[in-house]
């Protein structure tokens, strides 16, 4: 049985291969997850790690969930999400479809990554439980792409009825404005993990939601 969607976390700490392979990552993740608690989620996002390594790392983070109630969401890898029993999976345009995931994992919460109001509508109609919409501001991972800022979030929120999580270059000082425009919450990667005190950085995001 799926968790009630009103319990969807509002601050999403997104990882990467590079972040998860840093020395002391699990210790830092524990601190971040403790701060966020059930208002937060850690996204386990990997393109390079082999399956056994990703599986072991996900299980380690899931143990931290038991202590902190911070959600664990696996990006793309439905097999890892199912094998570990995480709280959700985040699908991209390269992933299998939302209906396909529902057919094999009916209890799994499903997020969809979108880049337009139209994609958000399609994701909701397909049965996704939320969308991560971006990018809002220019980021090092998407150099040269035009920043969409708050008008983009307005358009996405107006197009759907499920929760919208904004992503892309979002700093703590942006959060309140984005939430006031109807977003359920925000996702951040470098803004949390590249800070010397990731625990404090996460708390800054949470305090603005």
PLM regions and their residue ranges:
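C-terminal binding/interaction regions
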Residues: 181
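A short, flexible beta-alpha/helix-coil linker loop
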Residues: 18, 137-139
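Short, glycine/charged-rich beta-strand-loop motifs at protein surfaces that mediate ligand recognition
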Residues: 140-144
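Short hydrophobic "strand-cap" motifs at the C-terminus of beta-strands
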Residues: 167, 189
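Short, glycine/charged-rich "phosphate-handling" switch motifs in NTP-dependent
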Residues: 184
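Conserved N-terminal beta1-alpha1 strand-loop-helix module at the mouth
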Residues: 1-129, 145-148, 155, 161-162, ...
């Amino acid at each position: 049985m799926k968790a009630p969607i009103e319990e969807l976390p509002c601050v999403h700490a997104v990882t990467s291969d590079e972040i998860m392979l840093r020395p002391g990552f699990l210790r830092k993740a524990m601190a971040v997850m403790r701060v966020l608690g059930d208002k937060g989620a850690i996204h386990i996002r990997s393109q390079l790690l082999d399956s056994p390594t990703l599986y072991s790392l996900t299980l380690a983070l899931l143990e931290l969930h038991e202590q902190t109630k911070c959600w664990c969401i696996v990006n793309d890898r439905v097999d890892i999400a199912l094998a570990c029993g995480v709280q959700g999976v985040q699908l991209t345009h390269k992933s299998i479809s939302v209906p396909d995931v529902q057919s094999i994992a009916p209890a799994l919460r499903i997020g969809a990554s979108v880049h337009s109001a139209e994609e958000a509508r399609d994701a909701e109609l397909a049965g996704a439980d939320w969308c991560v919409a971006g990018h809002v501001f220019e980021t090092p991972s998407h150099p040269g792409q035009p920043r969409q800022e708050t008008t983009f979030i307005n358009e996405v929120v107006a197009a759907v009825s499920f929760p919208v999580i904004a992503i892309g270059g979002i700093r703590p000082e942006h959060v309140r404005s984005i939430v006031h425009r109807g977003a359920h919450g925000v996702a951040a990667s470098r803004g949390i993990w590249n800070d010397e005190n990731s625990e404090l950085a996460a708390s800054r995001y949470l305090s603005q939601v």
